[in-house]
Amino acid sequence: MATITIEPATSPRWDDVQHALSGGGDGRSCQCIWPVVRNKVWQTTTLDERRDMLQAEIAAGPPPGLVAYVGDEAAGWIRVGPRTVQQRILHTRAIVAATTEPLDDDSAWAVTCFVVRREHRGQGLNGRLLASALDYARESGARLLEAYPVDTSTGSHRSNDLYHGTVSTFLAAGFELGPTLTAGRVLVTRGLAD
């Protein structure tokens, strides 16, 4: 079995980020820009513009996500960072109503996206990405990590709808269940002092 490693998404890893995002699902077309822009911007941007936005975000630093490698192949991605730079969180009514954290608190971070290439699914990469995201957030000064995963116990879901992650993955990583956001989605949190 190939070794799995997780690394920050930095400019030298740009091609790997693109490889991880392009292996099935909406990652290639989204470029993981959905969490950081409002609807009006999202609806008026092209794939090339989204790609440029992500590349600029990575170049500016700090890394907005992590890349999972299976051997030497970029196989997965997770977006993790302060909620304050993920504009969609700040303007999603269900999240704003459910969170108990101040929206302007830079120490409250969020996981908002997972992508795993089709050929690497079913190997536990989401769990590995999440564990590394916890470490990365803690090392970067975050005191709390929040997420908005899908509750797969409520029925079947298309794989493209699981980019938020699943409740079971977060619970296995020590997150606590919070309020329901919408049908099939909940808020989960984990303090990072431990």
Q: What are the residue ranges of the model-derived segments?
A:
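Conserved N-terminal entry element of GNAT/NAT acetyltransferase domains
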Residues: 1-39
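Conserved beta-hairpin
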Residues: 17, 63-78
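Short, solvent-exposed beta-strand-terminating loops
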Residues: 20-23, 78-89, 135-137, 144
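Active-site rim helix/loop that mediates acceptor-substrate recognition in acyltransferases
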Residues: 30-64
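Conserved acyl-donor/pantetheine-binding loop and adjacent beta-alpha core of acyl/acetyltransferases
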Residues: 56, 60, 74-117, 121, ...
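Conserved GNAT acetyl-CoA-binding A-motif
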Residues: 108-111, 137-159
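Conserved acetyl-CoA-binding loop-helix of GNAT-fold acetyltransferases
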Residues: 111-116, 122-139
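C-terminal "cap" of GNAT-fold acetyltransferases
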Residues: 160-194
